[in-house]
Regions:
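A short, charged helix-loop
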Residues: 32-66
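Short alpha-helical interface patches
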Residues: 20-29, 155, 159, 163
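Short, solvent-exposed coil/turn linker segments
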Residues: 19, 37-38, 147
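NAD(P)-dinucleotide binding in Rossmann-like oxidoreductases
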Residues: 26-40, 95, 99-101
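Residues in flexible loops and secondary-structure boundaries
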Residues: 21-23, 44-45, 55, 135
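Conserved nucleotidyltransferase catalytic core and NTase-mimicking acidic/glycine-rich helix/loop elements
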Residues: 55-215
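Surface-exposed beta-strand edges and their flanking turn/coil or helix-capping segments
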Residues: 18-20, 27-32, 50-51, 104-105
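Conserved catalytic core of two-metal-ion nucleotidyltransferases
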Residues: 1-26
Length: 216
């Protein structure tokens, strides 16, 4: 049984009660457990908390490709929402999938640079500590999604960031950079131009990025 408790002094406790016969399984289930009190001396071994189960893990070539596939091939769903003026549909696919895959790729970059020996926290909450200020500021700027134009700009920038980071990860791990980028890039630019009548303030940078990636 679980109880979420907020006290008058604003201390918060998530209290879970379980049968004694489940104690061993509970202790084995999460290496972050720290024993504060064991009044009846029921725990017969030392419990040393560690976050090792949550360390960023080196992706296989298949996992890397799957991340790229998901990022690029969900982009058309975001674009569909933007073109149809269905902003919540666009935001949902952006945040739930496209952004998630970008953060996952950035976490692999962090893992490579730190020897895959640390965690970036739940929901990537510590990732700022391990990336450049420039990357962090650009990442934060993609969270402004209060208008169709801002979402388009966020999408262009997410593509730029993903292309740069995934290219670096591929190079460091000796994986092949997939072809999804080129076709989805063209589709994104064409749809933006068709439905907004603009070429986009990021268009030249966007084109330069994809051309540089092709040459590598």
């Amino acid at each position: 049984f679980s109880y979420l408790m907020l006290f008058d002094d604003y201390n918060k406790i998530d209290l879970t009660l379980l049968p004694l016969e489940e104690l061993d399984n509970y202790l084995k289930g999460d290496k972050l457990i720290k024993v504060l009190i064991d009044k009846d001396c029921r725990i017969k071994r030392d419990i040393v908390p560690t976050d090792i189960d949550y360390h960023v893990r080196k992706p296989s070539a298949r996992e890397y490709d799957d991340c790229c596939n998901e990022f690029w091939n969900v982009t058309p769903y975001v674009i569909k929402g933007l073109c149809r003026k269905e902003i919540l549909f666009a935001i949902d696919h952006f945040n739930q999938i496209v952004r998630h895959e970008l953060l996952r790729m950035i976490s692999w970059k962090v893992g490579i640079e730190t020897g895959f020996k640390l965690s970036v926290g739940k929901n990537y909450k510590f990732i700022e500590r391990y990336i450049s200020e420039d990357l962090w500021e650009k990442l934060l700027s993609t969270y402004r999604m209060d208008s169709y134009e801002n979402i388009w700009e966020a999408l262009f920038l997410c593509h730029q960031l993903f292309r740069a980071v995934s290219g670096e990860v591929a190079e460091r791990l000796h994986y092949a950079y997939p072809e999804y980028d080129r076709n989805i890039t063209k589709y994104t630019r064409d749809m933006y131009k068709k439905y907004t009548g603009k070429t986009g303030c990021l268009d030249s940078t966007y084109a330069a990025d994809i051309e540089e990636r092709r040459e590598q």
